[in-house]
Amino acid sequence: MVLIRVLANLLILQLSYAQKSSELVIGGDECNINEHPFLVLVYYDDYQCGGTLLNEEWVLTAAHCNGKDMEIYLGVHSKKVPNKDVQRRVPKEKFFCDSSKTYTKWNKDIMLIRLDRPVRKSAHIAPLSLPSSPPSVGSVCRIMGWGSITPVEVTFPDVPYCANINLLDDVECKPGYPELLPEYKTLCAGILEGGIDTCGFDSGAPLISNGQFQGIVSWGGDPCAQPREPGVYTNVFDHLDWIKGIIAGNTDVTCPP
């Protein structure tokens, strides 16, 4: 009965978002069902985001994914045929940089969510560790998410799509984004020739470099996957002290300047 209810919810929500979105992983292929046990599907208001399971009680996503009536699904691959171990949670607490729900489009787009109850690990649900070192420019990065697989006309897959892109130097990003300042705690990643990218409803999903969780999908060009307009990601490594402090119960910890 629980699985039937989850299936019904996912199908209804998918139809709702198909009318409102035109964005997500562009230029990818279906993810292997076993490669994303940490990837969560976040629904709120009339929108969809991704997120990353850090441990049995915590999810990391983008601040602009905050909204009312938030539902968090874990263990999802196909929306039409959910895995038997799909679990649903709602937020117990939300934490933002500078103890504020406000954020700029360009910086500090990060939100920690404490779940209402612990998640049970299973075949399709497992956390992704925080990074132990910063990412290297030029490294291959893995992106993933549900949503439109075409940049203009909406084409939503039932399963998450994955793709490989490269971590770029900030200098390579600057021509497309003059508003991107050196002091921002962000990463720039993509393909300068275009054709592969994350997009709007992929917000909050992870950027994985050399097996480490290094970025959170934040913003980019419109339409997605255009030449010299790569994606911009919140830098997870730069926020480690804040993330670890909040999880440890230190709510007075501050974000990096």
Swiss-Prot record:
Snake venom serine protease that may act in the hemostasis system of the prey. PROSITE patterns: TRYPSIN_DOM (PS50240), TRYPSIN_HIS (PS00134). This is Snake venom serine protease Dav-KN. It is found in: Secreted. One of its GO terms (molecular function) is toxin activity. Belongs to the peptidase S1 family. Snake venom subfamily. Keywords: Disulfide bond, Hemostasis impairing toxin, Hydrolase, Protease, Secreted, Serine protease, Signal, Toxin, Zymogen. Disulfide bonds join 31-162, 49-65, 97-255, 173-188, 199-224. GO terms for cellular component: extracellular region; secretory granule. Pfam families: Trypsin. Residues 1-18 form the signal peptide. Its EC number is 3.4.21.-. Its main location: secreted. One of its GO terms (biological process) is proteolysis. Residues 19-24 form a propeptide. The active site is at 64 (charge relay system), 109 (charge relay system), 203 (charge relay system). Expressed by the venom gland.
